[in-house]
Design a protein with these regions (language model features):
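Short helix-capping/hinge motifs at transmembrane helix termini and TM-loop junctions
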Residues: 43, 59-62, 92-93, 134, ...
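Interfacial segments of alpha-helical transmembrane regions
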Residues: 55-83
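Alpha-helical transmembrane segments in multi-pass membrane proteins
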Residues: 73-77, 81, 85, 89, ...
Length: 208
């Protein structure tokens, strides 16, 4: 069976809820462009990985070991959450919204719907990026997560249960990543050692 085959479908109440959201929000000025912008930012968690990378580099330049761990966890969490959502999608194989009354406002890389990878990675990243930035707990998720979840409905590419489950899965992934800072510290130490070893093997300009 292909990983893109679809077996599950959403019920009528989910379809009605999605149509209701689009009826209220989709035609408001600026909503669709903003939703598409969020879609591109969260695609494959690339925007969140980039943000974590910038923070990690800045912490490295400052020599702040604790901050490096936090920013590394943000990147790891975003990647891990995205991967977890893909794994669940391939088990559930729910088809994306396809009712003719639903307006689809953006292309998607997959026909699979449950859970929303955007919701999963954004929730994990928001929790972990907020922690790395030193913001109050819940502050960044409160700003980032609701708009991302709503945007997936406005664009007609997910059902309400897709985004709700994705957010829950993302929170679980964030908690798993931060359970033991020592694992991340060891990974960073290994990466640093590997980098030094590689640099040590590269001949200097005078040796070439």
């Amino acid at each position: 069976m292909s990983s893109e085959s679809t077996d599950a479908t959403a019920g009528g109440r989910e379809v009605d809820a999605l149509i209701a959201v689009q009826r209220v929000l989709a035609d408001r000025p600026g909503v669709l462009p903003a939703a598409r912008g969020l879609s591109h930012l969260g695609e494959h968690a690339l925007g969140w990985i980039a943000a974590a990378g910038v923070g990690y580099v800045a912490a490295t330049v400052r020599g702040d070991a604790d901050a490096r761990i936090r920013w590394a966890q943000a990147g790891i969490g975003a990647v891990g959450a995205h991967a977890a959502s893909i794994a669940v999608k391939r088990v559930v194989r729910r088809r994306r919204p396809h009712d003719p009354r639903i307006r689809v406002g953006v292309g998607t890389p997959s026909r699979l719907s449950f859970p929303s990878s955007h919701a999963t990675s954004t929730t994990a990243a928001a929790i972990l990026l907020g922690r790395a930035s030193g913001l109050p707990a819940g502050a960044l998720p409160a700003v980032l997560v609701p708009p991302m979840l709503t945007s997936r409905l406005v664009l007609g590419v997910h059902y309400p249960s897709d985004v709700a489950t994705g957010a829950l899965l993302g929170a679980v992934c964030a908690a798993a990543v931060t359970r033991d800072d020592r694992l991340t510290a060891r990974a960073i130490a290994w990466s640093d050692a590997a980098g030094r070893a590689v640099r040590g093997r590269v001949p200097s300009r005078g040796e070439r």
